[in-house]
Amino acid sequence: AATNLLGKFNVYNMTAAISAAYLLGISLEDIQEGVANLEEISGRFERAVENLPFEVIVDYAHTPDGLEKVLEASKNITKGRTMLVFGACGDRDRAKRPIMGEIAKRLADRVILTDEENYTEDAEQIRNEIKSGMGEKLPAHIKEIADRREAIKKALQIAQKGDTVLITGLGHEVFRVIDGEKVPWNDTEIAREITKELFEK
């Protein structure tokens, strides 16, 4: 059965769901129709922009395990480079930051380290803690752009045919907490806005 969902983890989930449906006596035709009509879940390996020569995927991955899985899933669907835009949340588990930095360095072909939402922490300090997992000197494939919109824009500008731009950390969220203040924000909508600015002239 064909589906619109991306990523190997979705294949595993669908396999389990198909098996359960079959065991419950649901016909193969109904199962096939159900799978074909599945829609992406907002912020979960979501294709944010259509009709570009490269993929733009938004995912909520905000833990080391989540980041590793989504990068591996991206590599499985990408002919070109996997380009990661990511950061880490403030006022949360600080120990995971260098681990996520190491994972990003190891698995992504290009990395743009950016701010996510700092809450009440110093945003630069959060980035520094992520960078501590990337080695003493940032490798050439890693750039740091604090402004999240500019980081996403840069990734979209340098993406080439067959690449995947992967924007992680906020997923389906519709706001960020910056210096204690809620600010409207959605990675998918921002990626779409920037795409229009760059490619629909």
Located regions from the model:
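A short glycine-threonine-serine/GTX helix/turn-capping micro-motif
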Residues: 1-8
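ATP-dependent carboxylate-amine ligase
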Residues: 6, 16-201
